[in-house]
Structures are given as C-alpha cells and as structure tokens.
Amino acid sequence: MTRLWELLRSILLWFVSWLHFLIFVPVLIALAIVLDPRKHDWLQRGLCRRIAYFSGAKIVVKRSPGFDAQRTCIFMVNHVNVFDPFMLYCGIPQLVRGWELESHFRIPIYGWLMKRFGNVPVPNIRNPRDLKRLWRMTQEAINGGTSLIIFPEGKRTRDGHVNDFEEGGFRLAQQLGVPIVPASLVGSFHHLRTGDWTLRPTTITIFLHDTIETKDLKKEDVPELKARIKEIIARPVEEWLQQGSQQESRPAAEVLR
C-alpha cells in the first residue's frame, strides 16, 4: 500500500510540475526575445520556487557567517538530480547562471534559451582552443556581475554521497582569481534519485558556506583547494545520510515514539 501511495503521489507531483513548467516557459521565452533576462530575474525565481513547491520540496537556506552575498563568485555544488538548478536558484541571493554542456545548446529552443539567459557552454576541454573559449566566456560572465554554478563532480550521485571532483573549475577559479563559495544540497537525494523517478516530499537545505579566496593561490595549490572544498561540501551531506541510516535501523516502535 505504501509503494502504491508513493507511485500515485509521484504521478500527481510530476503532472502538476510539468503542467506549470509548460505553461510558464513560453512566457519566459517571449520575455527573453524582447527583454534582457536580467530585467525579469524575479519572474525566473518565481518559476523556480513554484517548481520546488509543486514537486514536493520545501527549501531552507543556511548561510555561514563568512558567506559574502555581495561578491560575484563561483558556486561549487554537489550534483544530485535534475531539480538541482531550480533549487539553487531559489536559494542563492544574487544573479547566477551555470556551466552547462555545450551539447545542450544544440537542443532546439532550449539551447537558444540557455544562451540567451547567459549560461556558459562547456566544450570538449581536450581542445586548447575550446578551453580558452570557456575561460574567456567565464571571465566575461564574472566581469558582468553574474555568478556561476559549477557541479565539479561532472555527474549526478548514484548513492547520495559526494563523488570525486574534477579539477577544471578549480584551475579556472585560481587562474582568474575568482572567489569560490562551496554549497551543499542536503535532502535532494530523498526528493529524487537518479534512476528512480519517484518524487518524495521533503525539506531540501541549501548550505552556503564561507567564501574562499583564490587570488593569491598558485597552480600547485589547486589540488589542496579541491580537496578542502569537497570536504566542506560533503560534511553536511554525510551527516544527513548518517542520520537517515540511523533512523532506518531503529525499531519501528522506537521510530513512532
């Protein structure tokens, strides 16, 4: 009965979420044609908040004292599911866009919309020319006052734990001297897991950790920077997973108490 209820609830949540998305997106497309997307950022945030609500997610944001909301930066975030960008847009208190695979920009309508809104295409970085282009476009976004979201794992988690980080984003931040804000998405793995379309109502907590300077770092410091930021991001995620496993291992009578 529990599984049947989860199935029916998921169908309803997906239906309402997609219906709202399909109604709202044409409005954003029309506005993007005639207006700079910066002019209606509030509307985009409203869309993201409604997507979170209709999918069964309650967003809670926790800011560390050392997080500087006034500085343009790069947000390094763990990657859990397809809802991550929407949840982050609800919680990050500044204009923000993201790195996105260049192949996505070739998708009809969607690709144009992502380009128009200012996302940065990530090409095949084995090609030095493409790498320079990525560096240049990232620098232009930062100089224009747009913070960027990077998922350094390069893929979504399959088990809830934070995967190993790729080094590219950290090398870029070090070379450009852009500050990094580690951010943790906690609870998203319960909301929706990769490979399982079941949506579960839950609270998703976005931790915005202390802003970390990179301008005085050298190339040799990048591996240590990467390890440090992974540890910061993973800490609340691991604590949440540990609490969940402890609750599941408790006897039913104790859980109900």
State what each model feature region is:
Residues L4, L8-I11, F15, L43-I51, ...:
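Hydrophobic alpha-helical segments of integral membrane proteins
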Residues I51-A52, M114, A141, A173:
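A generic structural signal for well-ordered alpha-helical segments
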